[in-house]
A protein has these predicted regions:
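Glycan-processing catalytic domains of CAZymes
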Residues: 1-201
Length: 201
């Protein structure tokens, strides 16, 4: 389960060289902030660390060094504070798309590639990404040619995540509390004093 190709020069994970040794390769689609392994969090830590080690560098300088190391520029990110504002549509369209495409091309066989998707939480300690970001990741990855993914919720799926994923993978979930209900979201009668929802649908 390697990190996305942007980290390959620094982690020594060569997609082309590892492809013959594995039946499947699961590129980590980890883009959250804070915690560990997430792209935003990693870039933030490196910018902060470079600034601490080199007090004469401005934040702009530190971002420029990290961008040079990784060969990537985050759309809409000019400062550490910008990382707190979440991911732009352009981030998904450019960064997620390009990283997925690079993994697919490096491995050379889309049937061997399964995107390992997570949106923060435990065990990584990252800021939870909203369902719209999950949708952005999945849509951009699919547009780049990814055929399969594995979603790693921690600890449980929420209703919005399940609805988004089911809409991409066959039959859209029927959000009916009397049927399947994701454990990561309380049923409607759990937060209204136990009153049953009216039979309107």
């Amino acid at each position: 389960i390697p990190r996305t190709p942007v980290f390959s020069p620094l982690t020594g994970q060569d997609y082309q060289q590892m492809a013959p040794y594995f039946d499947y390769i699961f590129p980590k689609h980890y883009y959250w902030h804070r915690g560990f392994d997430g792209l935003y969090g990693t870039i933030s830590r490196w910018v902060e660390r470079l600034g601490a080690w080199n007090p004469s560098l401005t934040q702009d300088d530190c971002f420029a060094v990290v961008e040079s190391l990784l060969g990537i520029r985050l759309p809409g990110v000019e400062s550490l504070l910008d990382l707190e504002r979440g991911h732009t549509d352009e981030f998904f369209d450019r960064v997620v798309y390009d990283e997925t495409r690079r993994a697919l091309e490096g491995i050379g066989d889309p049937a061997k590639v399964i995107g390992w998707v997570s949106t923060g939480r435990g065990p990584h300690g990252g800021d939870q990404m909203p369902p719209g970001a999950l949708s952005g990741i999945l849509q951009a990855a699919q547009a780049s040619g990814l055929e399969r993914f594995l979603y790693h919720p921690e600890p449980d799926f929420g209703a919005a995540e399940w609805l988004l994923i089911s809409s991409l993978c066959g039959k859209v979930w029927d959000e009916n509390p009397k049927g399947y209900w994701p454990t990561g979201t309380d049923k409607p009668d759990a937060y209204n004093g136990g009153r049953q929802a009216p039979e309107e649908i």
